[in-house]
C-alpha cells in the first residue's frame, strides 16, 4: 500500500471490472425507468402536491389571473377563485 493511501481500490480499477458493469447494467436503466414512470403516471404530482398541467386554471378562464394592486393581491385572487 502506498504512503497516503486510504486503502480503497483505485477508481480506474473499479470501472474496468466486470463485476461493476454487471451490477450497473441493471441498476442504471432501472433507476431511469423508475423515474420515467414516476413522472409519466402522475405520481410525482401527487407526491409533491403540485397541480397537474390541466388544472392550473378554471375551464372558463382564458388566461392567467393578473394582480393589479400589490398590497391587495390576496383578496383579488380570492375573488377570482370564488
Swiss-Prot record:
Gene3D superfamilies: Photosystem II cytochrome b559, alpha subunit. With its partner (PsbF) binds heme. PSII binds additional chlorophylls, carotenoids and specific lipids. GO terms for biological process: photosynthetic electron transport chain. It is found in: Cellular thylakoid membrane. It is a single-pass membrane protein. SUPFAM superfamilies: Cytochrome b559 subunits. Its cofactor is heme b. Heme binds at residue 24. Pfam families: Cytochrom_B559, Cytochrom_B559a. Keywords: Electron transport, Heme, Iron, Membrane, Metal-binding, Photosynthesis, Photosystem II, Thylakoid, Transmembrane, Transmembrane helix, Transport. One of its GO terms (cellular component) is plasma membrane-derived thylakoid membrane. The keyword Ligase does not apply. The chain crosses the membrane at residues 22-36. One of its GO terms (molecular function) is electron transfer activity. Coiled coil: none annotated. HAMAP family: PSII_PsbE. Belongs to the PsbE/PsbF family. PANTHER family: CYTOCHROME B559 SUBUNIT BETA-RELATED. This b-type cytochrome is tightly associated with the reaction center of photosystem II (PSII). PSII is a light-driven water:plastoquinone oxidoreductase that uses light energy to abstract electrons from H(2)O, generating O(2) and a proton gradient subsequently used for ATP formation. It consists of a core antenna complex that captures photons, and an electron transfer chain that converts photonic excitation into a charge separation. Heterodimer of an alpha subunit and a beta subunit. PSII is composed of 1 copy each of membrane proteins PsbA, PsbB, PsbC, PsbD, PsbE, PsbF, PsbH, PsbI, PsbJ, PsbK, PsbL, PsbM, PsbT, PsbX, PsbY, Psb30/Ycf12, peripheral proteins PsbO, CyanoQ (PsbQ), PsbU, PsbV and a large number of cofactors. It forms dimeric complexes. This is Cytochrome b559 subunit alpha. It comes from Prochlorococcus marinus (strain MIT 9515).
